[in-house]
Amino acid sequence: MKNINGIGIALVTPFNKKGEIDFISLEKIVSYVINEGVQYLVLLGTTGETPTLKLKEKIDIINCVKNISQNRIPIVLGMGSNNTEDVLLTLKLIKLDNFEAILSVCPYYNKPSQEGIYNHFKTISENTDMKIIIYNVPHRTGTNINLDTINRLINNRDNIIGIKEASGNIIQSYNFIKHKIKKDFLVFSGDDTIGLPIVLGGGDGIISVIGQAFPKELDFIYKFAYKNQVNKAYKLYYKIFKILNLVFKEGNPSGIKTLLKIKGLCNKYVRLPLLKGSKTLEKKLYIEYNNMLKTQ
């Protein structure tokens, strides 16, 4: 298995004006982030607007990204549902060769108990040899996975290798890092706004949204963090701080697509029920982006 740590990119799914997948822009983004030094890719996650994609579109995206990446860096595939049986079916329908792991979100809407969450991931792990990264994002799912459940899972299932922790609760993240019962269990930040302190506190990296706009900047930020050069890391972090806050003002991925449009990487079209970033947001991002360029 290739090494999954450092900076992973939660890829957008670019669309054209007709709402069709813009594969040329997808190829451009994938090539850009790989060439700029990110460590791995994550596709078909929240940022990729996966709930709006048909199965054939998902397969086409997978093939496109594989073709461009050419095994240069690891790829993690998003595969989650609030129906456990749906995940098991998807495992059978999609070819998982050349993927290093799957990223599977905690069941949403149903609001299962911790025992339900445990059995959901236990069942998935029993039905695949793939490595599994749990995705905890309670502000979207309505359910938060706790430390005891994580430790039960990793104690009983060797192929559950990590968690993308996006609760926004840095204390919870630190608890996962400090009190996990397996040292090699990976804890990734799933939140760009607190990714740096999580890595400085012992986390294994970040699955980033903003990184597809600033891959080189993030590469430097986190390399400084791993070397415990805190001042240098934060100096670079604060250069993108205003942009980072703006990107999430109108939701994800509307904001990041607006920024990617400014950078010439893709259009800002999204699929309903999301709306594309407003002209006001685009103007603010344009100003801050140009201000940032002036300081380099």
Swiss-Prot record:
Chief location category: cytoplasm
InterPro entries: Aldolase_TIM, DapA, DapA-like, Schiff_base-form_aldolases_AS
Catalysed transformations (reactions): L-aspartate 4-semialdehyde + pyruvate = (2S,4S)-4-hydroxy-2,3,4,5-tetrahydrodipicolinate + H2O + H(+)
Nucleotide-binding listed as a keyword: no
Keywords: Amino-acid biosynthesis, Cytoplasm, Diaminopimelate biosynthesis, Lyase, Lysine biosynthesis, Schiff base
Main EC class the enzyme belongs to: lyase
Binding positions (pyruvate): 47, 207
Compartments reported by the entry: Cytoplasm
Subunit structure, interactors included: Homotetramer; dimer of dimers.
Name under which the protein is recorded: 4-hydroxy-tetrahydrodipicolinate synthase
